[in-house]
């Protein structure tokens, strides 16, 4: 079997990053990114997601090796019909690991096209960590990372984000 890469799929249109997505787990990729792709295909949205890897160890490198492409398999009923489809998802622009490249993470605040921040952070990721300060980057908790990004956006006097936790 060939490794998934941009060389073996139909070229997706170049679209700006409009979504900053915290998390690269199965739910986020098969639900949020799949929905972005469906909206892009229908002309309802014209953007991609940049994923922020929430932990130092994650799927970022694996996704990069596949040019940020992956397959979602849909099985079930749709409009009363049985479906079993495989779709290559092309709605992810990149993955940023803030533990390795904090500057790239903060640079997301500079992107005028970025409108949305989406997260599927659980209660375990939403907790106070006294070591998480703006000066102590990268922060460990989701709220602290988000605060750092929002503060950077504020410093740049850019428009706010719509945050979907």
What do the PLM-derived regions correspond to, one by one?
Residues 1-165:
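Non-transmembrane, aqueous-exposed alpha-helical and coiled segments at domain scale
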């Amino acid at each position: 079997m060939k490794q998934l890469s941009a060389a073996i799929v139909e070229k997706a249109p170049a679209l700006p990053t409009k979504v900053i997505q915290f998390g690269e787990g199965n739910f986020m990729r098969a639900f949020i990114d799949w929905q972005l792709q469906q909206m892009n295909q229908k002309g309802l949205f014209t953007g991609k997601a940049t994923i922020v890897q929430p932990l130092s160890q994650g799927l970022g490198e694996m996704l990069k090796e596949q040019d940020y492409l992956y397959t979602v398999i849909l099985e079930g009923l749709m409009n009363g019909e049985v479906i079993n489809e495989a779709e290559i998802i092309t709605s992810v622009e990149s993955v940023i690991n803030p533990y390795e490249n904090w500057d790239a993470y903060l640079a997301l605040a500079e992107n005028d096209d970025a409108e949305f921040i989406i997260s599927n952070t659980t209660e375990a990721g939403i907790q106070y960590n006294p070591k998480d300060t703006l000066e102590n980057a990268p922060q460990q908790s989701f709220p602290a990372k988000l605060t750092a990004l929002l503060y950077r956006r504020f410093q740049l006097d850019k428009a706010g984000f719509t945050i979907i936790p």
